[in-house]
Curated annotation (Swiss-Prot):
It comes from Rhizobium etli (strain CIAT 652). InterPro entries: Integrase-like_N (IPR017856), TACO1_YebC-like_2nd/3rd_dom (IPR048300), TACO1_YebC_N (IPR049083), Transcrip_reg_TACO1-like (IPR002876), Transcrip_reg_TACO1-like_dom3 (IPR026564), YebC-like (IPR029072). Its main location: cytoplasm. It holds the Pfam family TACO1_YebC_N. This is Probable transcriptional regulatory protein RHECIAT_CH0003714. The lineage of its organism: Bacteria, Pseudomonadati, Pseudomonadota, Alphaproteobacteria, Hyphomicrobiales. PANTHER family: TRANSCRIPTIONAL REGULATORY PROTEIN YEBC-RELATED (PTHR12532:SF6), TRANSLATIONAL ACTIVATOR OF CYTOCHROME C OXIDASE 1 (PTHR12532). Coiled coil: none annotated. One of its GO terms (molecular function) is DNA binding.
Length: 248
């Protein structure tokens, strides 16, 4: 297990999930609004909006919140958000990619740069670390849909590239360009996915010790606390021993 998936598991074990739920809803709502503005406000005619709503439902976001976010896109006074990607380095030379939706690029860039600097990292130029990641589609299912063999069979039939299963669920990877087609094909055998999204997956992971892992966790935590930041990806890896200590 590596990178951001380890961070999520640590936060889950520490019980931090509930504390960030309201912030998560606002981030999901922002993605829904941007998706609705980018195309039609009808999820059956707008693939990005359909996936945004699906991901929001998977996080138990109330229907009223989802409807409000869609309606906000039609408002004349609605904010216009830009999609921005930041790339930089964390402690131990680890690579970090930050995706944001912002109505003020200067504010967000300043905040992200400050967070990197305070954590002993450095914000780089666009492209400075993304070459060491693959931009792929990731479709997740709960363990209850079936065992690893069943999911693997369905994934191969749907045209996916890989499947990983752990105690949290099934993670199906496919080409970014095929995300919509693969997720649709999977629904016939496995039902609706829990989440369907594009992610940055590290080609190689950088092992870090406990001290650097703690610094990285603080850095990622601070980035995710920023209202404009939607997703954070990294290529760090810690041993099971360090993971157990950090999760305590």
């Amino acid at each position: 297990m590596a990178g951001h998936s380890q961070f999520k598991n640590i936060m889950h074990r520490k019980g931090r999930q509930d504390a960030v739920r309201s912030k998560m809803f606002s981030k999901l709502a922002r993605e829904i609004t941007v998706a609705a503005k980018a195309g039609l406000p009808d999820p059956t005619m707008n693939a990005r909006l359909r996936l945004a709503i699906q991901n929001a439902k998977a996080q138990s976001m109330p229907k009223d919140n989802i409807d409000r976010a869609i309606k906000k896109a039609a408002g004349a006074d609605g904010e216009n958000y830009d999609e921005v990607r930041y790339e930089g380095y964390g402690p131990g030379g680890t690579a970090i990619i930050v995706e944001a939706l912002t109505d003020n690029r200067n504010r967000t860039a300043s905040n992200v740069r400050s967070i990197f600097t305070k954590a002993g990292g450095a914000l780089g130029e666009t492209g400075s670390v993304s070459f060491s990641f693959d931009h792929v589609g990731e479709i997740t299912y709960k363990l209850s849909v079936g065992d690893a063999d069943k999911v693997m069979e369905a994934a191969i039939e749907a045209g996916a590239d890989d499947v990983e299963t752990d105690e949290e669920g099934h993670y199906i990877t496919c080409a970014f360009e095929a995300l919509g087609d693969v997720s649709k094909a999977l629904e016939s055998g496995l039902g609706e996915a829990e989440t369907v999204k594009a992610v940055w997956r590290a080609q190689n992971n950088v092992p870090v010790d406990e001290e650097k892992a703690q610094s990285l966790m603080k850095l990622i935590d601070s980035l995710e606390d920023d209202d404009d930041v939607q997703n954070v990806y990294s290529n760090f890896e810690v041993s099971e021993e360090v993971l157990a200590k950090l999760s305590a």
